[in-house]
């Protein structure tokens, strides 16, 4: 099938913003003006077309990123028809995984900012993510109709807080209740949108006299910025020649694609003003799939060999699965971005990460929550496949005869965990299946069974993330669940070496008795033990057993029972029932009885000898220490460091981010002090800081902490 839209006229872009900047409303207006959505959905009524999960509509925040295809010929229908693949991304810090994964497959972005709040906390996080993936972007300053709206203030903040070169393409005519339209600095005309047609119609007019001077100054800055794109243009500009409109657009486009500048538009999505002109900016300034560097990958058999794929229908097929959604009607939907080649429904492709072939059933093009079945997808397309069995987020799907593994997405480790159990026994199996499916959809959500407590532990990116998971269990899978406070995985060990313990288990009361006698020595495992080629392989589960029996004082057949008794005892330590680690036990002496000795008797004797010896060897409780990295604007650095110290954290040093916009604080903090940290850090820094943490090591817990844990235990 021939291409209906040349690839140069594709625009794959995301709509990014801080929570409440009006991103979903902006997306809705895009769908309305591009003719895809006949009735505008309002977030205020919980009816937005793009927010398609019930919870999103209730909470008024966007959780899942919905991919939508739309078409645009320009506000005045003067441009050739372009195909938009739009991804709406969430702005809440608990869902940064959604933003990351959509950025990975996009070519450009529209950054929505609030004209009142300006560069808000989450804007900085999202901006840093966009920098990481080198995503060219334009900005839309929304809510110009709101009290306190100030376009110039936001332009200044982009420079001050984000280090961006903001280039206004428009100026607002009025603000707050008096916001009437915009001045187009390219055409040097005023634009007013017609309210009766919900902004579908508009008219050009002369710039209001009181804005003429400001418009000329802003245009001069815009033209100067464009001229810096090449020496040729700069010479022309400095020589006093006028630059043509097409030259200015092309030059600004070059600089936007190089992420050197951020062109700025303004309006009020709610009042149907400005979104239309911003869409023209998407066509004029954001990249097509052929404007971005070829996608990188590696050879399936040798990951040191780099490969690339061109955005071309004739190249071998390659695509990245970037999201999986469980759909109530068709099951698992795998969203994928095609980087090269073509794919037809019914084709077999290779999942090169898993080394498995997958048959593509139906291919669906998504419009928010509605879908249309299509026969094929081409380079640059974003679509969803039905019926893939082994594909998870971040996997590459490619031609069987031309394998490649595309650069994978990195997902942060979960930072908060809690125990969850079904309210009724009958829901146990259902809950297991449901959690498995949710974990497949969302790589930042993990499920595991705690071997020590038998509890199901769910882990995610924050309290809200896990709240929504529990909520989805109820809504989508009808599983009612109770959630508990998470437990810290403490451990127990000893600090004294060569502690002797002698225990005799003897019961002789007529008939066959029981007799087992062991003498053991307890010591901590040393670095030398771990380096010893003979001993190191025998260290299992951080426990080392050494049989030093000579002369047959304990027959050989009972030695395994002695070890078994010890290994069973260390799974639940004598202090507070946590696993024992880093202990070496040497069996040095004992005795036996010809008739009454048995495996069970020696197992009991070794277990009791261990418990008694452990108590004498100065036992300590160990707590997990997490390596924490916090990225925070400098204004909050003192508060954040103070809080780290209050949490018994040890600062390891600090640094600044590459662009100098934020501080990076590294610290070691006990896990027990980290619960609720995501929420605390958010309120401390107005949501502007982010953190990651990973397990680093265990170390002895302070006496007061150990006593509190043992009381509980």
UniProtKB/Swiss-Prot annotation:
Which family would the database say this protein is a member of? Belongs to the TRAFAC class translation factor GTPase superfamily. Classic translation factor GTPase family. EF-G/EF-2 subfamily.
- Which organism's genome codes for this protein? Stenotrophomonas maltophilia (strain K279a)
Q: Where does GTP bind?
A: 17-24, 88-92, 142-145
SUPFAM superfamilies, sorted = EF-G C-terminal domain-like, P-loop containing nucleoside triphosphate hydrolases, Ribosomal protein S5 domain 2-like, Translation proteins
BP GO annotations: ribosome disassembly
What is its subcellular localisation?
Cytoplasm
Q: Which GO terms describe its molecular function?
A: GTP binding; GTPase activity; guanosine tetraphosphate binding; translation elongation factor activity
Domain tr-type G per the UniProt entry, residue ranges: 8-290
Q: What is this protein called?
A: Elongation factor G
What NCBIfam families does the record tag this protein with? EF-G, PRK12740.1-5, small_GTP
Stored Pfam families: EFG_C, EFG_III, EFG_IV, GTP_EFTU, GTP_EFTU_D2
List the keywords (alphabetical). Answer: Cytoplasm, Elongation factor, GTP-binding, Nucleotide-binding, Protein biosynthesis
